[in-house]
Structures are given as C-alpha cells and as structure tokens.
From Swiss-Prot:
<keyword id="KW-1035">Host cytoplasm</keyword>
<comment type="similarity">
    <text>Belongs to the coronaviruses ns2a protein family.</text>
</comment>
<dbReference type="GO" id="GO:0030430">
    <property type="term" value="C:host cell cytoplasm"/>
</dbReference>
<dbReference type="Pfam" id="PF05213">
    <property type="entry name" value="Corona_NS2A"/>
</dbReference>
<dbReference type="InterPro" id="IPR039573">
    <property type="entry name" value="NS2A-like"/>
</dbReference>
<protein>
    <recommendedName>
        <fullName>Non-structural protein 2a</fullName>
    </recommendedName>
</protein>
<dbReference type="InterPro" id="IPR007878">
    <property type="entry name" value="Coronavirus_NS2A"/>
</dbReference>
C-alpha cells in the first residue's frame, strides 16, 4: 500500500521548549549574538522541536489526539532520555540547531498517527532541528554572515523524565505565538499521571466489549454522551483532559469496573449495584 505523505502540511506535532528555563537562557544568548553581529533576520520567539508534519482536517483532530496519548501511554521511561542541542548552522533560510535524542519519539508518533488513518511525515528525510531565526534573502547572500553563523558554538542537553514539563501538541501552521508558546489545538503533558492509574494498561482494549447501555443504567442521566462514539471517546483514555470523567464513571458503574478489570464484557453476570457517592 502506498504511503501518503504530508508534503503539503497544514499542522505539526510540537514539542515546546519554553518551559526549560536553562535551555531558553542559552538559546536567547545565541540569538543575542546573531543580532549583535548585525545579521538581518527574524528571531524565533517560540522555541520548539517540530516532531512531524501533518496533513489533517478538523475531523482528524480526535484521532491524532488519541494517537499522541497512546504514544505517551506506551513510553518506557527508565531513567528518562536526553535531548541534545548543538551545531548552529543554516538550513534553508533558517539558522537552526541540530537536535539529537528524539528520533524514536518521532518514529512512534508517525506510526501511531498513521495507524489512525491520518497523514503524517514527509517524503524527505526528517531532520531533528530547533529553529533560532529566519534569515532575509539579503542576509543569506552575505558571506560574512554565513561564516559567522558557521563559527558559532552551542552545546546543551535537557533530560526528559516523568516529572519534566515536556508536552506534545497539535499546532496549526501559522498559529499565533504568545509568551513563548504556540496557540495549540491539543496539548498533553508527557509525564506519568501519578494521581490516577488506569485499571488496565490500555482502556481501549475493552472497547467494543463493555456495553454502554448497561453502564448508562448505573449512571445519572446525562453522565455519558448520548452518542455512542462520543461516549467511547470519553472513556477511551485517562489522560489530562478527561481524567475526572473517567474516574467519575469508574466509581459510579460496577459494570464498567468489572469490564475494565476483566478486559471483557460481563453482561451475563450483571446485577444492579448501589451507586457510590463522591
């Protein structure tokens, strides 16, 4: 089967860097050197790593959202991992840093998003980088500018672990920037949610087995969306944006708890259970 590529992208998966204060101080120091040298350029005000480009429509947001969270769910943290920034140089019209350490994360995001039927990654090889500034055509044509940029030094590492302020985001190309961040469609913390552990590694494993009609009988009217697809979406992951909803239904529905624990439907053994109060 031919692979579709996002060669005309309209969104990207963003890894924002503004939360990492030590990196930002050094990053801004590099920008100051460039401006102090008189290089005509537009400074990047939202430092980030573009992990993959996307060609998606608003109706795909839900699928990409879930794919991102499944990547987070499947991460094997160990002692965490390091991201290394080095080698300022010119890439196209931009001054960039090489970025090492996120290759596996890029591959996982592409694979999980494609598994949802959405278009990710480009036909050209992905190169991990962090943009510092964009050069004007005039600045790019000045040999002294090019020589200065190629002579610059930068070497910085950040460690990513479950307590780091690392996030994965869906961002539309051309999105507004404010206070060092892009306006996002979806933004998820990559760390482990210590406040709640799902009864299964993947709640999605029981989707299609647990019966919504039975679950609805144990809940208050309106607790679950009337549309079945919307209801499954609400229950299909336990991350930041609906952790309260998941815990609420898990507490209230005996059937849902048993289905989660057994990874199977237990309708034949269903009985009315008392509703637990918050």
């Amino acid at each position: 089967m031919a692979v579709a590529y996002a060669d005309k992208p309209n969104h990207f998966i963003n890894f924002p860097l503004t939360h990492f204060q030590g990196f930002v101080l050094n990053y801004k120091g590099l920008q100051f050197q460039i401006l102090d040298e008189g290089v005509d350029c537009k400074i990047q005000t939202a430092p980030h790593i573009s992990l993959t480009m996307l060609d998606i429509q608003p109706e795909d947001y839900k699928s990409v959202d879930v794919a991102i969270q499944e990547v987070i769910d499947d991460m094997h943290w160990g002692d965490g991992f390091q991201i290394k920034f080095e080698n300022p140089h010119i890439l196209g019209r931009c001054i960039v840093l090489d970025v090492k350490g996120v290759e596996e994360l890029h591959d996982d995001l592409v694979n999980y998003i494609r598994d949802k039927g959405c278009v990710a990654d480009q036909s050209r090889k992905w190169i991990g980088h962090c943009t510092i500034a964009q050069l004007t055509d005039a600045a790019l044509s000045i040999k002294e500018n090019v020589d200065f940029i190629n002579s610059m030094q930068f070497n910085y590492k950040i460690t990513i672990n479950p307590s780091s302020p690392a996030r994965l985001e869906i961002v539309k190309l051309g999105a507004e920037k404010k206070d060092g961040f892009y306006e996002t469609i979806v933004s998820h913390w990559m760390g482990i949610r210590f406040e709640y552990t799902s009864p299964t590694d993947k709640l999605a494993m029981i989707m299609g087995y647990c019966c919504l009609d039975v679950v609805r009988k144990e809940l208050e009217e309106g607790d679950l969306p009337e549309n079945d697809d919307d209801a499954w979406f609400k229950l299909s992951y336990h991350y930041e944006n609906n952790s309260w909803f998941f815990r609420h239904v898990y507490r209230k529905s005996f059937h849902f708890r048993k289905a989660c624990q057994n990874l199977d439907c237990n309708c034949l053994g269903f009985y009315e259970s008392p509703v637990e109060e918050d």
